[in-house]
Regions:
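Short, mixed-charge low-complexity intrinsically disordered segments
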Residues: 16, 33-64
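Intrinsic-disorder/low-complexity regions
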Residues: 1, 11, 22, 48, ...
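Short aromatic-glycine-(Arg/Gly/Cys) micro-motifs in beta-strand/loop hairpins
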Residues: 1-16, 45
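Short linear motifs in intrinsically disordered
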Residues: 1, 28-33
Length: 64
């Protein structure tokens, strides 16, 4: 049984929000529609390790 889960971390004005998903499809969907800097992580509950899968808009600055 695959027990991996996925987290999308979204950065907004100094705050970081984590959204947990049971499957990669839903996590990638949030990554595709999110306008703020975000990253996608694969997580293993057995080892508590995270592996970076994708990072978007990391260097993009939004005008206020």
């Amino acid at each position: 049984m695959d027990t991996r889960y996925y987290i999308v971390m979204v950065q907004d004005y100094g705050e970081v929000y984590e959204y947990e998903f049971p499957d990669l499809y839903r996590a990638r969907y949030l990554m595709s529609v999110e306008q703020l800097p975000c990253s996608l992580w694969e997580c293993s509950p057995q080892s508590s390790n995270r592996r970076l899968l994708d990072s978007r808009n990391a260097t993009r600055k939004l005008a206020i």
